[in-house]
Amino acid sequence: MTDRPMETVADSNSSGSNLASPRSSTDSRTPSASVRSLRLSSHAPNHQHRQSISDTLRATPGSPRARRQPSLTQAAIQSLIDNPPAPNNANPAFVGRDWREISIGELVSPDDLKFVEINTGIEEATNILIDTGAPVLLIRESPQHKSAVGTFDYADLNAYLLLAAGLTQPNEELLASYEELARKAKEGIPIPLRDVKDLGRKEPLTTLPASASVMTAVQTFGGGVHRVVVVSERDDNEVLGIFSQFRLVKFLWENGRSFPVIDQLYPQSLHDLRIGSRDVISINGDRPLVDALQIMNEEGISSIAVVDSHFNVVGNISTTDVKLLTRSSSLPLLRNTCTHFISVILSNRGLEEGKDSFPVFHVNPGSTLAHTVAKVVATRSHRLWVTDPLSPSSSGPPTPSHSSVHIPLVTNSSPPPSPAVNNGTAAPAAYLSAPSIPASALPGARLSGRLVGVVSLTDILNLHARASGLSPADPAESRSRRRRSSSSSVGVRRSGEIGRELFSGRIV
């Protein structure tokens, strides 16, 4: 995603020269100038065949680079794209070791832990989450406690923002706690994490001892668990670290040569490995942002693909992006389009991180596992969208793939239906008048193809587990459990004064 500076061959007379152009040297000469040139010719007969400066400028020799033969053939370039070399920063501590003997305790550090107390206000917790850059905060009873009683991440923040905006209708058994939140908001009492940590769908807190092997982690993560809390063998109440799917995939990629059973999978295509899911959730770019937030909260997913009218992927919205919505001044964004919010995300990345590139969150069925994992690690994404680069409605060139043969993941030829989301009451006119960014104007609109599936970290680790002879749990069953354990049902019906009270000033 980086651009190399182009080398150019510049003429020394291209700027700052007092020489006349070829046209002015012939058409605008004065008679005296003609005489002088004739006199010079008569005194220098040996120079009559020498090229003039004008002739020299007309016939500037081409750059030697233009005649240079490519050092790599197209096939070699394609092979390099499909099978990117693993990073050279493999940890020498794991070279030559049987990966079944490597413990997860070797891969975590207490320095990575970020704790908050259960009575910490949600505003303070949100600031810590954003300022530290941690993907998750561990919740403990008090600073003296070494055990975790829960977690707080961007999915929880998303659930709270929906509640604060009055866009979540709680289940019957949660009405009392919902009213308590309203009372605290009206009285200006800080709302502690204790009251909001379980608002959204989340998996049970899973722990593993530090002595557990990497294979145990592969089997656990391959069954749909996204992160585990690593605890001491001597005291299972003492937290030593936190280990995630992403960290494990990154570790296996960087040290793949030490694990032949996994390394042999990388050159194979997603289609041949039968990896990925056809059950993909997307949202049209012209839908309100609040619809995307509700879908992620209801489905328990960390990101959602944004598509255009032809189902080409034009962008990606994740729960991490809700950090851009934590002030009341961000309220209009909820009613603006998903496409507009993507432009806000890109603008924020450029201002804060100095990045003007567009991260590519998609692959295609012919992409190799190596190409896919390298992209996952580079974008730090939990999911990549699988697109059909050869569809008639594609808006740009295909993502490089191992084969030019189109092997779709889906069998139906009709476009998949857009997620059904109740729009509820009409948005205020102020929101409707906000400028809208067309999907075709986004960088992603020129890169992708038609959305046909999704491949996640769970899919990759489930494949690794099965290739290693393990029997991981069915990820689909894990997703079903999260849905059944949902603490709220999504609705866009506003909750009157409660939403306005919670939305006064800063949301959190």
Swiss-Prot record:
<dbReference type="GO" id="GO:0042149">
    <property type="term" value="P:cellular response to glucose starvation"/>
</dbReference>
<dbReference type="GO" id="GO:0030071">
    <property type="term" value="P:regulation of mitotic metaphase/anaphase transition"/>
</dbReference>
<comment type="function">
    <text>Involved in DNA replication and cell separation.</text>
</comment>
<dbReference type="GO" id="GO:0006508">
    <property type="term" value="P:proteolysis"/>
</dbReference>
<feature type="domain" description="CBS 1">
    <location>
        <begin position="108"/>
        <end position="173"/>
    </location>
</feature>
<dbReference type="InterPro" id="IPR001969">
    <property type="entry name" value="Aspartic_peptidase_AS"/>
</dbReference>
<dbReference type="InterPro" id="IPR046342">
    <property type="entry name" value="CBS_dom_sf"/>
</dbReference>
<dbReference type="GO" id="GO:0004190">
    <property type="term" value="F:aspartic-type endopeptidase activity"/>
</dbReference>
<keyword id="KW-0539">Nucleus</keyword>
<feature type="region of interest" description="Disordered">
    <location>
        <begin position="469"/>
        <end position="494"/>
    </location>
</feature>
<dbReference type="GO" id="GO:0005737">
    <property type="term" value="C:cytoplasm"/>
</dbReference>
<feature type="domain" description="CBS 4">
    <location>
        <begin position="336"/>
        <end position="394"/>
    </location>
</feature>
<feature type="domain" description="CBS 3">
    <location>
        <begin position="276"/>
        <end position="333"/>
    </location>
</feature>
<feature type="region of interest" description="Disordered">
    <location>
        <begin position="389"/>
        <end position="422"/>
    </location>
</feature>
<keyword id="KW-0963">Cytoplasm</keyword>
<feature type="compositionally biased region" description="Polar residues">
    <location>
        <begin position="39"/>
        <end position="57"/>
    </location>
</feature>
<feature type="compositionally biased region" description="Low complexity">
    <location>
        <begin position="20"/>
        <end position="34"/>
    </location>
</feature>
<dbReference type="GO" id="GO:0005634">
    <property type="term" value="C:nucleus"/>
</dbReference>
<feature type="region of interest" description="Disordered">
    <location>
        <begin position="1"/>
        <end position="71"/>
    </location>
</feature>
<feature type="compositionally biased region" description="Polar residues">
    <location>
        <begin position="10"/>
        <end position="19"/>
    </location>
</feature>
<dbReference type="InterPro" id="IPR016711">
    <property type="entry name" value="Ssd23"/>
</dbReference>
<keyword id="KW-0129">CBS domain</keyword>
<dbReference type="InterPro" id="IPR050511">
    <property type="entry name" value="AMPK_gamma/SDS23_families"/>
</dbReference>
<keyword id="KW-0677">Repeat</keyword>
<dbReference type="InterPro" id="IPR000644">
    <property type="entry name" value="CBS_dom"/>
</dbReference>
<dbReference type="Pfam" id="PF00571">
    <property type="entry name" value="CBS"/>
</dbReference>
<protein>
    <recommendedName>
        <fullName>Protein sds23</fullName>
    </recommendedName>
</protein>
<comment type="similarity">
    <text>Belongs to the SDS23 family.</text>
</comment>
<dbReference type="GO" id="GO:0004865">
    <property type="term" value="F:protein serine/threonine phosphatase inhibitor activity"/>
</dbReference>
<feature type="domain" description="CBS 2">
    <location>
        <begin position="199"/>
        <end position="258"/>
    </location>
</feature>
